[in-house]
Amino acid sequence: MPSQKPTILLLNGPNLNLLGTREPQIYGSTTLSDVQERCLALASSLDVELRHVQSNHEGALVDAIHALRRDLPLAGVVINPGAFTHTSVAIRDALLGVGAPFVELHVSNVHAREAFRHHSYLSDKAVAVICGMGVDGYAVAVEFMAKRLKAQAAAKL
């Protein structure tokens, strides 16, 4: 049964568990735990439910996306797919198969980095793409998705 509140699934892909310690000159020193706490507080203030999943395993992310079906139509995804951005047809297909709107998020500006990072299997289907804002991009993405889901709910009344 769908939740009464809009639900945002915050997904973080491979190596994001190392946020704050891995290449801090690129990704900063804020940890994923800090990001999650900030996003949970923001979601609460916006009166939306937020669930967080981080995995280094593609199938676990696909399973989390599939589980979101129970919250449709008031559900959306904020995803930092990490390296799966450039390789995962499975995550793309899961997002499209579930049909929830999603925001693609990257801490760094992937377009200012190596050429292989310039291609995304998700961007053409995302409702928004945020990159290069550091961890501040998470709050922007959560707020955007919350507003979108609330507007969608209001339109159905």
UniProtKB/Swiss-Prot annotation:
GO biological process, any:
quinate catabolic process
Q: Which UniProt keywords apply?
A: Lyase, Quinate metabolism
Pfam families documented for this protein: DHquinase_II (PF01220)
Q: Which residues form the active site?
A: Y27, H106
Enzyme Commission code(s) on record: 4.2.1.10
* Domain of life per record: Eukaryota
> Which NCBIfam families does the UniProt record give?
aroQ, PRK05395.1-1, PRK05395.1-2, PRK05395.1-3, PRK05395.1-4
Assembly and partners are described as: Homododecamer. Adopts a ring-like structure, composed of an arrangement of two hexameric rings stacked on top of one another.
Can you name this protein? Catabolic 3-dehydroquinase
- The scientific name of the source species is Pyricularia oryzae (strain 70-15 / ATCC MYA-4617 / FGSC 8958) (Rice blast fungus)
What phylogenetic lineage does the species belong to? Eukaryota, Fungi, Dikarya, Ascomycota, Pezizomycotina
- Encoding gene (name): qutE
